[in-house]
Amino acid sequence: MKKAFFILITLIGLSNPAFSQTYLGFEYNPNIPVKVGSTTLKHPWTGGINYGQFSTIDFNFDGLEDLVIFDRSGDEFILMEHTVSGALHDYKYVYKGHQHFPECRSRAAFVDYDSDGRKDLFTYGIGGIKVYRNVGNATTGLQWQLITDILQTDYSNNVSNLFVSASDIPAYSDIDFDGDMDILTFHIGGQNVEYHQNQSMELYGVPDSLVFVLKNQCWGKFSEDPNNNILFLNESAYPCENGDIPNPLRDESGRDSTNTRHSGSTLLAIDINNNGVMDLILGDVSYPNITLLMNGGTAPNTNSVMISQDHNYPSAAHPVNMEQFPAMYWEDVDFDGKKDLIIAPNARTVSENQYSVHFYKNTGTNELPEFVFQENNFLQKDMIDHGLGSIPVLVDENGDGLKDLLVANLFRYKPTLSLESVFQLYRNTGTASNPEFTLVNNDYLGLSSLGLGYRVVPAFGDIDGDGDQDLVVGQENGNLRLFTNTAGAGNTMNFSASVPLIDSNGTQISVISHAFPQLFDLNNDGLLDLIIGRKTGELTYYQNKGTASNPAFVPISSNLGKADITTAQEGYAAPHFFRENDTTHLFVGAYNGKVNYFRNIDGHLADGDTFSLFSSSFLDIDAGLYSTVFVDDINGNGLLNLFVGQDLGGIFLFEADPLSTISVEELRLEQKLLLFPNPGNQLVHIISKDGNISDLKLHGIYNMLGQKQEAELIQSTVDVSNLSTGSYYFILENKGKIEHLNFIKN
């Protein structure tokens, strides 16, 4: 039974054909090959990487270190399983790998602080560091125990949170070589590195505790220049003037506030030359390079003066040049037992997001590493990855009868310190039954030079009746523009210069901002209508009341179906209507990365009508941020494919699975809520099987005609006395999960 990656959505009705049995079951199925040039990508449908933080952990307790990437773009985990086939080691993407980890923000690093052989999790807590201990095993899998919401340290009898800025990455390392994990981090507002020594070995003789004292306010005896990335070595100004401090009082009086600079730094502590003291690699928010500081000391805790700095590290031939804010990670990523150097940006939105994982192979040893540049797109080269916020659309671009894949984006990084929005065209170089996509154009239509802004959204449809597909694009400013295809049926698309798309009154069509259009015959009259998602979360509907060759878009509703998907300040509604078994369905992508599924659409298109929300988290899909959806049977096998675009610039691919053994009865068993009494005629109580009701919401009660009934939820009770005798279904939400419960009024 495929329960790991499969959820079957079953729609059951009684008398109305619109509620006849329909299955929309999708399984993550990355089975369509994708090529760049002659190279077939190994992980095309894994979703991409923007601003990754790299660690390793044995997530399935098979003795192999797997790769975990925490991406700051949407605070999301990417899990790559270490697989072995004969002598071949490789990575395999684990769909929904994020479910193995607790929710984290800003940063995540896996370090075995208690030396039990299981790596623990260090992430951002407000003002510092939150810690989870790994208490899993091969039987239960990964399990996490929260050790502290905020790690504490002793500033000379003044215990307070060990401050680490949300933008920083500290060094978790055994600085004094005594067997427990210490921490290096920049001072809260200065240019100096603090050394927080773990007292676990000193106090208890075992490394199983996290008890810190500030051992040195100016570890390494250096400071950053407030105006550039030059470092002052052997610094004599406060707080470095006294060298090492056994356990200093945190005294801010000596600091010059005019020189306070620190706004973002990344640290990696390694004993590069194997001389028994830690050296330090630094990255800075304002500069593209990293700097190696060599420790001239002879023993930990007695002398940590840095004696040299190398701004071209790891080599003059291939120094790090990462726009912007490089961070460093020391992990074995090529399975040779030697830890390599990975460089990735640590600044959201302003950094490189397409060639953003630089791999330096360790050709030396772990004791004396030598890092040699290999590539600037480690793992990314094997994925569909086009920057930030992918938008997949299928269309036959060259008229060969095969649908091609066009990928729009929110934006991608453009050197130097700029951004651009583009379309990438993957031509279908396969067959009708065995599709294969090959990248043929990285800036289709030269979109980046047209000045249309960011997140330009394509929608295709023949709106002038000449047999070819025209193009409507939505802009971030809310405007829509029309590119008329003059190629004719069966030919490669050829577009005239764009013009504003106008409605039936000759007025330019525009919404508040971030227009997301779809051309779809919503009322099934043979004419393509226009639906537009908006940043504010609602859908705008224009019905086409013209002719096949002369469209006339008439505004009908600014809140179609009341399908408002806003869950926070912004919605970024990304609608996709499709028809299956003569029934219209609606998926809506959203800023929160979920996919909303609506039904009860046909016959409910007037302004003020309401669609039924079936799920606000369809298939538990989590795209991080900016989810988008496209549905089509790309290989003609009668099974729908689901393409999901997302924040990290790549795409998830699903296919309907009619062979699942999950039955309707099993789905009922998985329901957590019950209605009692049922049948009933007065007060109906909502009961949770596990006794846990949290943030219970009633989204509606509907009859079998799909008409919403007047009802109010008071605590966990609904008065149904005003309902007519008959069958209904309740749409309830408990702990963020939508459930549909049948009910009979007697």
Question: How does the language model describe each region?
Answer:
Residues M1, H82-V84, T486-A487, Y729, ...:
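Short alpha-helix boundary/capping motifs
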Residues M1-G25, T661-V664, R668-L669, N678, ...:
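Bacterial Sec-dependent N-terminal signal peptides
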Residues T10-S15, I150, E224-D225, F232-S236, ...:
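Compositionally biased, intrinsically disordered low-complexity segments
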Residues N16, L417, T492, E580, ...:
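Intrinsically disordered, low-complexity coil segments
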Residues A18, N50, M704-G706:
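Intrinsic low-complexity/disordered segments
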Residues Q21-V664:
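Beta-propeller-forming repeat regions
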Residues E666-N746:
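C-terminal outer-membrane/trafficking sorting elements
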